Amino acid sequence: YFPVVAGNQQENGQERQYLSKVSVDLSYVFFEKFPEPSERVKLSLAFCEPESLWSYEPASFDLPGELFIRQQHSKNIFQKAGSVVLYGICTLLLPVWLLDGVLAVKGLHPLHEAAAGRHGKSAVIYHAHGLVHDLTGYGYSVREYKTGYFKKCYEHACRKVPQTKGILFLSERRVENGGNLDRIRACVQEKGLSYREFLTETPVHKLSRKQIRECAEMVAEAKLIILEDFVPQLHALTMRPETQILQMWHACGAFKLFGLSELGVVDHLTQSSRNHRSYTAALASSSGVVPFYSEAFGIDERCVRPVGVPRTDVFFDTAYREQIREALYTRYPVCRDKKVILFAPTFRGSGNKTAYYPWEKFSVEKLMRELPQESVLILKNHPFVRDCCEIPEEYQDRVLDLSREENINDLLFITSVLITDYSSVIFEAVLLNIPILFYTFDLQEYLEKRDLYFEFAAFAPGKIISDMEALIKAAAGLLDDPTEETSPAMTKTQFQRLFLDALDGHSTQRTMQLVEELLATGD
């Protein structure tokens, strides 16, 4: 699937028309395996209704395979030497490029796409980097340099290691207790399967050269690499054909655009991106979201396996739920016999490095002043966001910041009302039938920068609110009477059928069967 943003035009009961203009580079439709020049490749058009009903248009294109073959341009030794010399000259002229970046930041001319989503000094530096990189193929990005070093270490390790074996758990986000990776790792240990792990919250540009070498060697040796999020440096590699990669994506459903679905929405993503496209298999929470994951990861639909999401199994385990509730009440006695509001927003920004939340838009003081005394507020930041709001002294006994302390799934077991925005936590909340309030003060801005798979108003299983005063009133109303929840356009039953039909308490078991299947591939 190649995503196309289209405008819907319909007048006076006439047929709907979808108008769009897009340029598709056919040489990047396929990842590494290209068709033969004599083969024919059929392209067709499709669109998705809000109910996830896909319709395929009769119009299609039958094109020769040669149009899809990417021409590989490798530099000879003289061209490489010339690029190095030119890079040296450009470095001497670095003040010129930086001045050009300052002018671009001030809006006097366009900012280079390498600086998309950045501001201030960071935008100036990445603008200069982009200009020099375009001219020479080299730049000043620490991430690019260390990713290149990772690639060289991997290629060297592949020559040393004749045969792959075992499992590698790879992540650069915090591994939560009870999360996908944690549960599958426990099963691997129980079965006595050979595994290694490289788990860090440090992105590649902050890793030492020694750490990069260690990681590259582990990747080269692994028969199966298991992820639960995006690991960007992995996609710079041309993987060994016998290596399998399983993406256990951390989120359920399909809410915010992610991966390659953001083509045409975010400036820094181009069709030539290798991101995600090397996955052998990816988990999905329902058959209804398979096309979206296929599009987002740039992989065949057959590689998206709707076997469920392992971390959701606990929602079907009554004994576990009671055990966790009691453990949380023991650690946080203020929550016992209280009505708990969980505030769990997603991040703003373009990713891990730039993530933030505009806390000036959420007033803890105003909210707690109006809520009943027997209520408690828990703040749970997205893992990418480092800073949280200040908790007023008079409410520190009723407000807990557990952003770095607890698994968000576990917190849902003691939650009376969830306040969120565009976070995928809504899927788990629906499983537990928790009332949801969507505090979306920046909806239009968010849609312009990130966008969603569905129209928000037709999709959200809860009340949509845009200002703090209305949020306070709605939260107080739900604490007083949970049945007061406004009927959303899509009922929770419809929502669950569309996004969560593979979740039944046995996702971990099915995922382990897939792990063993991938390990056996090629044996």
Show where each model-derived region lies.
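A donor-sugar binding/catalytic signature common to diverse glycosyltransferases
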Residues: 225-254, 406-450
